[in-house]
Amino acid sequence: MAIEKKFVNDGYVKASMDEYFAEQLNRAGYGGMELNRTPMGTQIIIYSEKPGMVIGKAGKVIRKLTRDVATKYNLENPQIDAQEVKKPELNAQMMASRLAASIERGWYFRKAGHNTIRAVMNAGALGCEVVISGKLTGARSRVEKFVDGYIKHSGHPVEEVVDEGFAVAIKKLGTLGCKVRIIQPGVVLPDSYKVRESVEIEEPAEKPAEKQVEKPAVAPKKEAAKAKAPAPAAAPEPAPTEEPEVAEPEEAEEAQVEASEDFEEAELIYVEGSEEVRRQVNGVWQHKHESYDYWHPMARVHKEAKE
């Protein structure tokens, strides 16, 4: 047998076997099958809502299915295993069978379609599509589609992530095809993406400011040099220390001199041969004379009077 004919024959056997099980196990809630060929034989897994009805009393039903499959499809040593479906709402074949049964019982097709969509989405599916085709109302056949969530229609992901089921409802006007397609929860789609959440970095707490120790003010070198300079020769007392030139206004100096008089009474020294009077206040020599009749430091340079 050519390789092409072998693949076609395998597909035909699987599709025909699926229809046979759906017909025989309709009351057991048939939900699909898997066919695996191994060196030990052919393993068939049947998914059902009621696996007890698939096995039958003392295994009577499952032995009958095994004999029929081996004879009809020429399979060597077939082994059938029945497994229960925990969530029938997420099985496309089961929901298609329920939809067809609801329409046969007389439900309006829109009500049956919306109920099927609602049950599937409440079970946690990412998306669901229900297609009902045939003579719904009137003499002409048409197609009604109900969609909720996200559904893939083409490409390779359709074969991997989309579960598809089909059932037939027989009405007086004719037959109706019921197709259900479901995307299971937790499926990672090729076009899905996740946005990273922004992370806020907390800034470290500021340390308390250290107390700054005030350093004692150091007198400039010029002031220290002038402080060591001897007093004028005309003074009978020890040489007074000279202060550097002060750029402050005369009013500030007068206020300083008056303030010093309140705290300390200094001894007055009269210079012979002139109207100059001297005194020492807080280590600073002061004098006053005819030109400047107020107490001021002796180190201050007097401006010459204009002619």
UniProtKB/Swiss-Prot annotation:
<feature type="compositionally biased region" description="Basic and acidic residues">
    <location>
        <begin position="201"/>
        <end position="226"/>
    </location>
</feature>
<keyword id="KW-0687">Ribonucleoprotein</keyword>
<feature type="compositionally biased region" description="Acidic residues">
    <location>
        <begin position="240"/>
        <end position="265"/>
    </location>
</feature>
<dbReference type="GO" id="GO:0006412">
    <property type="term" value="P:translation"/>
</dbReference>
<dbReference type="InterPro" id="IPR001351">
    <property type="entry name" value="Ribosomal_uS3_C"/>
</dbReference>
<dbReference type="InterPro" id="IPR004044">
    <property type="entry name" value="KH_dom_type_2"/>
</dbReference>
<keyword id="KW-0689">Ribosomal protein</keyword>
<dbReference type="InterPro" id="IPR036419">
    <property type="entry name" value="Ribosomal_S3_C_sf"/>
</dbReference>
<dbReference type="InterPro" id="IPR027488">
    <property type="entry name" value="Ribosomal_uS3_arc"/>
</dbReference>
<comment type="function">
    <text>Binds the lower part of the 30S subunit head.</text>
</comment>
<feature type="region of interest" description="Disordered">
    <location>
        <begin position="201"/>
        <end position="265"/>
    </location>
</feature>
<protein>
    <recommendedName>
        <fullName>Small ribosomal subunit protein uS3</fullName>
    </recommendedName>
</protein>
<dbReference type="GO" id="GO:0019843">
    <property type="term" value="F:rRNA binding"/>
</dbReference>
<keyword id="KW-0694">RNA-binding</keyword>
<dbReference type="GO" id="GO:0022627">
    <property type="term" value="C:cytosolic small ribosomal subunit"/>
</dbReference>
<comment type="subunit">
    <text>Part of the 30S ribosomal subunit.</text>
</comment>
<keyword id="KW-0699">rRNA-binding</keyword>
<dbReference type="Pfam" id="PF00189">
    <property type="entry name" value="Ribosomal_S3_C"/>
</dbReference>
<comment type="similarity">
    <text>Belongs to the universal ribosomal protein uS3 family.</text>
</comment>
<dbReference type="GO" id="GO:0003735">
    <property type="term" value="F:structural constituent of ribosome"/>
</dbReference>
<dbReference type="InterPro" id="IPR005703">
    <property type="entry name" value="Ribosomal_uS3_euk/arc"/>
</dbReference>
<dbReference type="InterPro" id="IPR015946">
    <property type="entry name" value="KH_dom-like_a/b"/>
</dbReference>
<dbReference type="Pfam" id="PF07650">
    <property type="entry name" value="KH_2"/>
</dbReference>
<feature type="domain" description="KH type-2">
    <location>
        <begin position="17"/>
        <end position="86"/>
    </location>
</feature>
<dbReference type="InterPro" id="IPR004087">
    <property type="entry name" value="KH_dom"/>
</dbReference>
<dbReference type="InterPro" id="IPR009019">
    <property type="entry name" value="KH_sf_prok-type"/>
</dbReference>
